[in-house]
C-alpha cells in the first residue's frame, strides 16, 4: 500500500527513517525563529494601526523580519549572557533595526504572550499538514474500497475463520476511522485557532494600554488566527492536551491498519502484499523474506 502518514516526532534521527521531514521542520529553530518575528511584526502593525506606536517604526520592524537577521549562533551567544530565550532573540534582532524603531519592538507584550502564540502557530501549521495528508489518504482508501467490493476473503473472529467478507468491507472500516480522525483534528483546530494570546504578564491586559483587547484581536487577525478567547489560558494547557490526545488516536488508527496488513502478509496467509520496489530487501541474511514496510 502507499506510504501513509507524516511524522509528528520533532526529533531528527535515523530511527525515524520511514517518516517525512515536513512536520518536524515546523518545530526546528529557524522555523520557530521566523514565527517569533512574524508574531512581533503582527503586534507592531496592529499597534501602529491603532496609533499606539508610530507607523514608521512598525514598517522598520517589518522590513527586518527575516531569518537572515536572526542567526541561531548569535542567539546562542547572547543567551549565554542574558539567560533568557526571548530577550536573547530580541537583542540579536535589534542589531539590524533602526535604534529608534527598536524601542517599539515587543511594546507592552510579555514573553509568554509571544511564545504561546508561536506554539499556537506551530500547532496550526502541523494540523494543516496532517489534515491535507489524511484527505489524500481518504481519497486513496475510497478508491481501494470501491475496487475491492467483490474481493472475497475470510472474515475472522479471534483469529479464526468465521464468515466470508470482502476486502472492501475491511478497508471501509479504515476509511470511516480516517474520516473521524479528520473531523477530530478539525474540531481541535477550531480551538487552536482561537488560542492566540496577548494578555500581559498575569493575563489581565495590564501594560498593554486602553486598547489592549483591540490590539490582541487585530494582531491575531494578521496572523491568520480567529478572534481570540478572552480568558487567560497561559497556565491552562487543556487545548494542547486535546491536540496530543487526538494525535494519539490518529497514531493508534494507523497502528491498527499496519498490524492488520502485517498479519495478512504472513507466509501462511498471504492475502495482502505491498509492492516496495524491485530492489527492496527483506532481510540481510535470508533472501526468501519479503518483510512488510513497518520493520
Task: Kindly label every feature range from the protein language model.
Residues 14-191, 195-199, 203-205, 209-218, ...:
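A helix-coil-helix interface module used to build multimeric assemblies
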Residues 2, 112-115, 259:
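Residue-level micro-sites within transmembrane alpha helices that shape
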Residues 216-295:
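Acidic, glycine-rich loop-and-beta core segments that form the ion-binding/anion-interacting portion
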Residues 2-14:
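Classical Sec-dependent N-terminal signal peptides that target proteins to the secretory pathway
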Amino acid at each position: 500500500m502507499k506510504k501513509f502518514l507524516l511524522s509528528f516526532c520533532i526529533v531528527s534521527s535515523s530511527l525515524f527513517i520511514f517518516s517525512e521531514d515536513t512536520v518536524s521542520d515546523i518545530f526546528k529553530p529557524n522555523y520557530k525563529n521566523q514565527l517569533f518575528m512574524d508574531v512581533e511584526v503582527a503586534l507592531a502593525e496592529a499597534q501602529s494601526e491603532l496609533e499606539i506606536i508610530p507607523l514608521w517604526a512598525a514598517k522598520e520592524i517589518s522590513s527586518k523580519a527575516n531569518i537572515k537577521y536572526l542567526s541561531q549562533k548569535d542567539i546562542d551567544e547572547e543567551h549565554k549572557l542574558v539567560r533568557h530565550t526571548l530577550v536573547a532573540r530580541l537583542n540579536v534582532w535589534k542589531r539590524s533595526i533602526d535604534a529608534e524603531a527598536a524601542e517599539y519592538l515587543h511594546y507592552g507584550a510579555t514573553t509568554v504572550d509571544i511564545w504561546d502564540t508561536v506554539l499556537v502557530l506551530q500547532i496550526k501549521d502541523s494540523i494543516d499538514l496532517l489534515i491535507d495528508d489524511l484527505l489524500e489518504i481518504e481519497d486513496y482508501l475510497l478508491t481501494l474500497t470501491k475496487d475491492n467490493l467483490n474481493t472475497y476473503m475470510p472474515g475472522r473472529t479471534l483469529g479464526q475463520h468465521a464468515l466470508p467478507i470482502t476486502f472492501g468491507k475491511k478497508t471501509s472500516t479504515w476509511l470511516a476511522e480516517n474520516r473521524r480522525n479528520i473531523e477530530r483534528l478539525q474540531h481541535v483546530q477550531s480551538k487552536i485557532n482561537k488560542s492566540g494570546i496577548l494578555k500581559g504578564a498575569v493575563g489581565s491586559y495590564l501594560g498593554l494600554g486602553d486598547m489592549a483587547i483591540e490590539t490582541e484581536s487585530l494582531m491575531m487577525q494578521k496572523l491568520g488566527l480567529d478572534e481570540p478567547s478572552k480568558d487567560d489560558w497561559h497556565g491552562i494547557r487543556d487545548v494542547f492536551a486535546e491536540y496530543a490526545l487526538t494525535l494519539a488516536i490518529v497514531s493508534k488508527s494507523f497502528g491498527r491498519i499496519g498490524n492488520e496488513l502485517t498479519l495478512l502478509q504472513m507466509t501462511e496467509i498471504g492475502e495482502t502484499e505491498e509492492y516496495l520496489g524491485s530492489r527492496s530487501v527483506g532481510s540481510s541474511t535470508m533472501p526468501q523474506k519479503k518483510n512488510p514496510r513497518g520493520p
